[in-house]
Swiss-Prot record:
This is CRISPR system Cms protein Csm5. Belongs to the CRISPR-associated Csm5 family. One of its GO terms (cellular component) is cytosol. The keyword Phosphoprotein does not apply. PANTHER family: CRISPR SYSTEM CMS PROTEIN CSM5. Disruption phenotype: Deletion of the entire CRISPR-Cas locus (cas6 to cas2, Rv2824c to Rv2816c) decreases resistance to plasmids encoding spacer elements about 6-fold.
Length: 375
């Protein structure tokens, strides 16, 4: 191998469920629930198995997205039409369902406090390869590494909270883009402008996709918010996630040639000390925040957050709580006034992103990182 290229082996062990979405949603007409498991048949094979004279009826059932029929489960058509779901014929795969938490208590008729029970609806699918096997894209992990690097710079340079001028989403984005350009667009390649993406130091880092995982590594997880009073709120959003305990591996290669040739000499040191850097970011960014939530134990060490549903704090380098609240108000202010609540509770974001599996709470996206030099 070229002596400029330094390979590493990165491993992420899921402590909580990890969601990397494919952009697809599976409706209740595309799966069958049996106890605590969901069976996703191959819909093409299922359709081919339906007698020809019943196919128009099935098509009408699947395509009907109005009224009560919009959320009708698959069994409402297959059972009365004597079509037996058979994994041997219809292939597909089966996934366990995590615990489903009711909505937070609200006042109902007669002034009584009640919690609305929820059932599965649309399920956001995990990304899969052409053979239907889940995997984690290298681009997702590279984005996580980029966030860790920028967050570590922020926490090393100042003990004061990082402020963002203005409070609109656009202003926050522009400030973030300027910060990234200043810290990362340093290659200075010939015949380019300083702000060009080709001058980004992270161009020198390549991350492979993970090896294919198994569908048995997946779990259906509900989005659940927990406030600082320890009260959970189950939301009607469900995702296919990698289950806690799953290990994900990636090969990471850094080009240490001169920056003008697209390399990043200091990138080798960044990867060598990545576990220590992740641990310091975890301590600076999450320790005090997580301590605000009752029953949430502090976890020290190289803890990182990967994928969707992990919360705003994992996606930004801003540390000032009031500024976080302003940005969140700009995005979601019609629902909750984050600024007012942050001043009252002294925490932002206002909820911890969690889910339940067998009635045990987990944080979304939480992983333990390890890295070593590779051959």
């Amino acid at each position: 191998m070229n002596t400029y290229l330094k390979p590493f082996e990165l491993t992420l062990r899921c402590l909580g469920p990890v969601f990397i979405g494919s952009g697809e949603k599976r409706t209740s007409k595309e799966y069958h629930v049996e106890g605590d498991r969901v069976y996703f048949p191959d819909m093409e094979l299922l359709y081919a198995d339906i007698p020809a004279h019943k196919r128009k009826s099935f098509e009408a059932f699947v395509m009907n997205t109005d009224g009560a029929q919009a959320t009708a489960p698959l069994k409402e058509w297959v059972e009365p039409n004597a079509v037996k779901l058979d994994p041997a014929k219809h292939r597909g795969y089966e996934v366990k369902i995590g615990s489903i938490e009711p909505r937070r208590a609200s006042r109902g008729r007669g002034g009584r406090m009640t919690r609305k029970k929820l059932t599965l609806n649309e399920i956001h699918a995990f990304i899969k390869d052409p053979l239907g096997r889940p995997y984690v894209p290298g681009s997702t992990v590279k984005g996580m590494l980029r966030s860790i690097y920028l967050q570590s710079l922020v926490h090393k340079r100042t003990a004061q909270p990082v402020r963002v001028p203005g409070h609109q989403t656009r202003e926050h984005r522009q400030y973030g883009e300027r910060f990234e350009r200043k810290e990362l667009r340093k290659s200075g390649r010939p015949n380019t402008r300083p702000q060009d993406a080709v001058n980004d130091l992270f161009q020198a880092i390549r991350v492979t996709d993970s090896p294919a995982l198994r569908t048995s590594d997946l779990l259906i997880c509900q989005k659940m918010d927990m406030n600082v009073h320890g009260k959970p709120d189950g939301l009607p959003l469900f995702r296919e996630c990698l289950a806690p305990g799953t290990s994900i591996s990636h090969r990471v290669v850094v080009d240490t040639s001169p920056t003008a040739r697209g390399g990043w000499r200091e990138g080798e040191r960044f990867l060598e000390t990545l576990a220590e850097t992740a641990a310091s970011v975890n301590q600076a960014r999450y320790a005090e925040y997580r301590a605000m939530y009752p029953g949430v134990n502090a976890i020290v060490g190289p803890i990182v957050y990967l994928g969707g549903g992990a919360g705003y704090r994992s996606k930004t380098f801003v540390t000032d709580q009031d500024d976080m609240a302003k940005v969140l108000d700009a995005q979601f202010g019609k629902v909750v006034k984050h600024v007012d609540k942050t001043r009252e509770l002294r925490v932002s974001p206002l909820v911890l992103k969690r889910t339940k599996i067998d009635n045990i709470c987990y944080e979304m996206g939480q992983c333990e990182l390890s890295i070593r030099r590779a051959e």
